[in-house]
Amino acid sequence: MLRKYDRYTPIDDSVEFEATDDSFSFPMRATKLAAGYDLFSTKDEVIRPLDRKLIGTGIKLKKMPEDMQGEIRSRSGLANKYGVFVLNSPGTIDPDYRGELKVLLANMGHLPFDISRGDRIAQILFIKYETPTFNHKSISHYERGEKGFGSTGIGHTETLEEYNE
């Protein structure tokens, strides 16, 4: 049974990890109110400019509640300072996945990016989700129809009067 928690209570007791590598570090929050848990590299790596690399964390999920997912996201400092980010962000970790957590990092910077064993490379957030039941029904007609990207307008108007016209 999942216990109720608030934003100040860590949820690590409802998520269990197992080491796949001797040089692993368990995910940890940098501050008490940090939403994400930092993930660490287990090896020294280099990502060339405009390249990507799958980086191991040395941990795998042993247990996670069925109504929770992990989302692997970029660390803002790496993206801002070096142009290095999680390519498929957020990378979804389903509650039944049992392989090693790996991070797909891309280097959009102009210089090679060096990763040392133990460096913080990404963060993981644990988020509850719901799975809806889908019913087959006819689609109602709406004014918008199948119009998509940009169909409701782009840009901005200069005045409120122009907007209301």
Roles of regions detected by a PLM:
Residues 1-165:
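DUTPase catalytic domain/fold
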